[in-house]
């Protein structure tokens, strides 16, 4: 291993062939959508070699996970893929609940699934909208961003925050859904359906967009698997793998939805897969929203779920539980577990090793962006510099998740 310093690049590329240039795409550049750096050697407009540099937003989350309690680490998950934070929250909480063998009420699972799919739609809107902007098609983005804002308003009313939601808890939710939740979710889905089709016509059927994306940045199924691809980027390469279908969690085995599959793993096919996934997410939400069961929004778990404040102030038993959870944390039984969920970008996995204390002994996060970014040099090598922007955008690399 070596550190990719300025001296490293100076030594490696000090004898460039005549006519070749070394350019930096990032770390501060609109096309990178985050603090990412790519050192690119070009011959005219053609990319000869590329090298990716990571770590600009590294915040030691895995090490923090060994110091924080299981509840405290939840705030770190908000700051991974900050475009669809509830999916990160749910992935972490499911891993902890699995280790504790906690069964949550169906109401909790329904709400978690609805929020997950709304977050997936938000993430795909960002990815597709910004891809259009990167290729010069600004107007198409506006058709979906209005509906993304409507989803944000639901999440803000439900959680109190737009980005750092921290909504899940071990054994349940932070609070119950508000009275108009089901109605507003159905209105959002109703508005999204025609908007998605309009956006599809404006962007994915546009001749210029097709010319800039078809066959660009492609990857074979074999190479995608070798690099560790998952999610929409893996399915765009023709691999039928979705954690929700192949290793179901929550109630995904009880709902009906299709898994879209691409062919050549190009920018176009990654876009087509994400477009269809938005339709399928709406389909999942509509199956759930009318059937949210009544009942509690958390399990009867006094040693792990904080009691209501009014009970803490008026009941000695609740006061003791509150004190124990805050001061001593939640004790997870000794053991190790890996929990994978299908986040918007792919398989988000949390590997936890517990020694029975209030903090994990070891935490590892399998973040999908990390694997995509490793492939970037191979995907753009031999292509045009302008096409590298589209390739990066279609991979949907989020710096907060990449560096973790």
From Swiss-Prot:
The protein's superkingdom reads Bacteria
Query: Localized where?
Result: Cell inner membrane
Predominant location: membrane
The EC designation for this entry is 7.1.1.-
Q: What class of enzyme is it?
A: translocase
Oligomeric state and interaction partners are given as: NDH-1 is composed of 14 different subunits. Subunits NuoB, C, D, E, F, and G constitute the peripheral sector of the complex.
Give the protein's recorded name: NADH-quinone oxidoreductase subunit D
Gene from which the chain derives? nuoD
């Amino acid at each position: 291993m070596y550190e990719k310093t300025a001296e490293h690049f100076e030594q490696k590329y000090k004898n460039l062939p005549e006519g070749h240039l070394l350019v930096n795409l990032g770390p501060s550049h609109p096309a990178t959508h985050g603090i990412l750096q790519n050192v690119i050697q070009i011959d005219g407009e053609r990319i000869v070699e590329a090298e990716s540099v990571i770590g600009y937003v590294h915040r030691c989350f895995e090490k923090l996970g060994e110091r924080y309690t299981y509840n405290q680490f939840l705030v770190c998950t908000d700051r991974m893929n900050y475009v669809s934070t509830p999916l990160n929250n749910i992935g972490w909480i499911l891993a902890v609940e699995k280790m504790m063998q906690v069964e949550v009420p169906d109401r909790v699972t329904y709400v978690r699934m609805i929020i997950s799919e709304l977050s997936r739609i938000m993430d795909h809107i960002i990815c597709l909208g910004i891809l259009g902007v990167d290729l010069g098609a600004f107007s198409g983005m506006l058709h979906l961003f209005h509906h993304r804002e409507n989803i944000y308003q639901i999440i803000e009313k439900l959680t109190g925050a737009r980005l750092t939601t921290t909504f899940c808890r071990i054994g349940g939710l932070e609070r119950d859904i508000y009275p108009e939740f089901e109605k507003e979710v159905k209105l959002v889905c109703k508005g999204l359906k025609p908007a998605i089709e309009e956006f599809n016509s404006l962007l994915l059927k546009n001749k210029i967009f097709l010319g800039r994306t078809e066959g660009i940045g492609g990857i074979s199924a074999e190479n995608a698997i070798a690099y560790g691809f998952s999610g929409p980027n893996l399915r765009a390469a023709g691999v039928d793998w979705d954690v929700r279908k192949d290793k179901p969690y929550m109630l995904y085995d009880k709902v009906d939805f299709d898994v879209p599959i691409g062919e050549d793993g190009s920018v176009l096919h990654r876009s087509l897969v994400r477009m269809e996934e938005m339709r399928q997410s709406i389909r999942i939400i509509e199956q759930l929203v009318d059937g949210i069961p009544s009942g509690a929004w958390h399990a009867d778990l006094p040693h792990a779920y904080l009691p209501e404040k009014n009970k803490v102030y008026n009941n000695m038993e609740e006061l003791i539980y509150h004190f124990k959870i805050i001061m001593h944390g939640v004790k997870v039984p000794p053991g190790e577990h890996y929990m994978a969920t299908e986040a918007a970008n792919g398989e988000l996995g949390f590997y936890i090793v517990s020694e029975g204390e209030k903090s994990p002994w070891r935490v590892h996060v399998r973040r999908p962006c990390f694997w995509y970014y490793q492939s970037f040099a191979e995907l753009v090598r031999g292509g045009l510099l302008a096409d590298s922007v589209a390739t990066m955008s279609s991979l949907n690399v989020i710096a907060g998740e990449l560096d973790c």
